[in-house]
Amino acid sequence: MELNNLKPAEGAKHAKRRVGRGIGSGLGKTAGRGHKGQKSRSGGFHKVGFEGGQMPLQRRLPKRGFTSLTKEFVGEVRLGDLEKLPVDDIDLLALKQAGLIGEMMTSAKIIATGELKRKIVVKGLSATKGARAAIEAAGGSFAE
């Protein structure tokens, strides 16, 4: 089997409906466009959202909110994920390289989900009270 030999199954494809080709086809004369009016003419279209001169919906509704340019991207990391990391010194770069947080994240916070049994050193990351207690109970520490 090769890509250039692939064909759709018999009867799976239908011929395109040819309009305006005689009365016997059922789509002759007006070709399914009806009689008169803007939509029957060639080039007879209106832009999307046009409501015949009435104020369109997207302009009747109020604008809401904005996109902050100073938004901080903070990633969340679970204790269980830190357990699986091969390194003992954990900082933002190590989390990004391991794929635990996205490249756009400017900081990260450790949350107390899962278990941590080994000793780690956390550098420059924040943590919840429960996560901080669990890390220190496992013999780990925080280096700010």
UniProtKB/Swiss-Prot annotation:
Keyword Cytoplasm attributed: no
Ranges in a coiled coil: none
GO molecular function, one term: rRNA binding
Entries under Gene3D superfamilies matching the protein: 3.100.10.10
Function: Binds to the 23S rRNA.
HAMAP family hit by this protein: Ribosomal_uL15
Name of the featured protein: Large ribosomal subunit protein uL15
Organism phylogeny: Bacteria, Pseudomonadati, Pseudomonadota, Betaproteobacteria, Burkholderiales
